[in-house]
Amino acid sequence: MKLFLLVLLSFSLLVSCKKESTSSEKNTQEKKFDMYEMSEMAALMEQMYVDNQRLKERITKGDTIGKFPNHFIKIHNAVMTDESENDVFFKQQAAKFIKAQELIYQDPKNAKEHFNTGVDACIQCHQQKCSGPIPRIKKLYID
């Protein structure tokens, strides 16, 4: 009787172990890795961030400002991750941002003030729409 129980217990352990490995193999095969694709707006905002880092450095050093980056205008019609976010509020904040950016190049004597106004517009919009990048955006401020 003891031998029978020992054989039965051993058999159950082997069967249960085998089932687990089979199910983990299925899970590995079923998992699909989906690559995140940035929306046109997300990519534009990443580019604007980099451009503004460089601009901040030029303003801080007192270098020449250069020309307004015309690709910033795409903010008005770039495809967003969630199209419902492209509402009146977003359009107003985008206009404030563009106006501040244009003023940097039109009035370089007050570039720091105009630059920080542009950063303000970004933060105000992101407080309503997508708060994730706010800490990063705040690093753009010129003291």
Predicted features along the sequence, with ranges:
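The canonical Cys-X-X-Cys-His
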Residues: G118-C130
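Extracytoplasmic c-type cytochrome modules immediately beyond a signal peptide or single-pass transmembrane anchor
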Residues: E20-V119, I134-D143
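C-terminal motif of bacterial Sec signal peptides marking the signal peptidase cleavage site
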Residues: L14-S16
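Bacterial N-terminal signal peptides
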Residues: L5-S12
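N-terminal hydrophobic targeting signals that begin at the initiator methionine
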Residues: M1-K2
